[in-house]
From Swiss-Prot:
GO terms for cellular component: MLL1 complex; RNA polymerase II transcription regulator complex. InterPro entries: bHLH_dom, HLH_DNA-bd_sf. It comes from Gallus gallus. Phosphorylated. Transcription regulator. Forms a sequence-specific DNA-binding protein complex with MYC or MAD which recognizes the core sequence 5'-CAC[GA]TG-3'. The MYC-MAX complex is a transcriptional activator, whereas the MAD-MAX complex is a repressor. This is Protein max. GO terms for biological process: positive regulation of transcription by RNA polymerase II. GO terms for molecular function: DNA binding; DNA-binding transcription factor activity; protein dimerization activity. The lineage of its organism: Eukaryota, Metazoa, Chordata, Craniata, Vertebrata.
Amino acid sequence: MSDNDDIEVESDEEQPRFQSAADKRAHHNALERKRRDHIKDSFHSLRDSVPSLQGEKASRAQILDKATEYIQYMRRKNHTHQQDIDDLKRQNALLEQQVRALEKARSSAQLQANYPAADSSLYTNPKGSTISAFDGGSDSSSDSEPDEPQSRKKLRMEAS
């Protein structure tokens, strides 16, 4: 992309061929002045877009340096925010999973309340222990080793 893409100027081909050298030079100077003005306006716009330079006088080199620093800062900030979003999505998925498990447990508890344990709802597991039909068919008994608690991944919570 060239600097002249945004500038509408008449090309030399549209001018009559009988121009004098002075006219050609004047036309070329006008085109060059427009190009320089466009670059100057672009630097002013860039300067005003960088928070640390707004309203200050700065050289073109300073404007480019500060703009580069600001872009890098914003990239880091964007990356951090994206990590926070990913962490929150994982936490949300875990919470939704817990909600589904609790709703399932609640509906199981309601079923147990509606159908009290009777002889037909009690079964014997392979070890000879009596279990309820609502236990989910676990083969473990109270004599066996206790199940290890499920470990849950704790998500780091950072205040932003």
